[in-house]
Amino acid sequence: TNFRGYHGTDKSHFDSLDKDKEFSSQTLPCDLGNGLYFFIDRVNKTGEAIENAKKYLSRWKPKYKNKIIVEMELDLEQDKVLDLDDQVNQDIFNLFIDENEEDIYNELNHLIENNTKNRGNIDGLVLEIMIRAYDIDVKAIMKETYTQFDMSKQRKRSNIPNGKELCLRGYSAIKKKSICKELW
């Protein structure tokens, strides 16, 4: 299955984007686990992903000097993509938390305080523990999500999504990368 993802970053990071990274086991992973995050278009929402990448950059990366939006073409086997909008996958995820709550919170308590931990969303940690426990071969995780793009707004979190994210774990799926917008 082909995906087109948009990632907002600084131009200095462009060359290293498709290189595998080591993630610290000392910090809480982001909401969809460890990997490279993209916005992807939702059904019938063409252009939303690139706009979300742009808004993400201006809201969350104000110090970047040479802001760019990188477009990447990803080729992923469907059975290696964990779709967390799928009801069955949500049920398995919730059951895993119920059955492993003590282990999850023990691991959480040993992590370093950071912004992700302060936000209180432990989904990424649960996903990492679940993938480890079940030895799941997953190359990407995707989900419709809510991202706060405007810090002047009161709404910080929501269960109603304003976009869709894909967290790429297997970087060999990147078939092409290009700068599609330079914003500095």
Walk through the language-model features, giving the residues of each.
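Active-site and NAD+-binding cores of ADP-ribose-processing enzymes
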Residues: 2, 8, 18-19, 66-184
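Small-side-chain structural scaffolding
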Residues: 5-9, 46-49, 53, 72
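Short, solvent-exposed loop/turn segments at secondary-structure junctions
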Residues: 11-12, 44-45, 77
